[in-house]
């Protein structure tokens, strides 16, 4: 198959000329391999963490052929991989990670273990660990490199994909992929997992700690509320969502909002409604005015140089958004 085969507009890269973002945010997950201790040391949203990585898991050369992938899979299956999986699951529970955060963590671990030239070892390791966590993932090959093929619970935009048995498999690799580049899938489905990776936040991510909250002043909110207003935002969370895959708006609107952030917003609005003795109808109109006029209007391309729907915390952090974020 080619990368464009069976794909439609929702998966293809945008043909709009990209601008330059106003500010770049770094992913708040840093990983390095500690070979002497057989583990990966992490700076995870400001917290030190350690994930065991047994030498028995370390793969030698893997080529982008099904036989080589099968041999690597067998080695990993016979390795001491459970401590690694248990450590990742433990971090998932402690920090309230969603599925995309788990994938990002697994990816960072594999990149700490293997150099940039060892793309295939990275991809096989990612596929193996995610499958042990019951996620449905596959791999394919593009030229000499393996790529991850990931189905999602939601529709994803601006990422190329192929369709296999009515399931969209989104392509994540380490090299640019042309629209006519042949992509080969393997007949053997190594992963037995059935869970689709979801982009939604069904619970609050506990990352960064209280010291990482940044007080953000909102001049337009202050003007509408009639007093100075600021809101605490978990900066590591905003850094994490900066490069988030683009999905349907409901993914953003239905995601859980940070507790400290929501309490501050609700407290400020509630006090204004009570202070002014608003009726229910007046309160609704007031809140709608706040949502529609409390942010500077900026297009995605002005802010980020690309299409990017915003989570609620991001709208507050940047103090700007556009129509789709105000729905």
Named regions from a protein language model:
Residues 1-327:
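A structural boundary/capping signal
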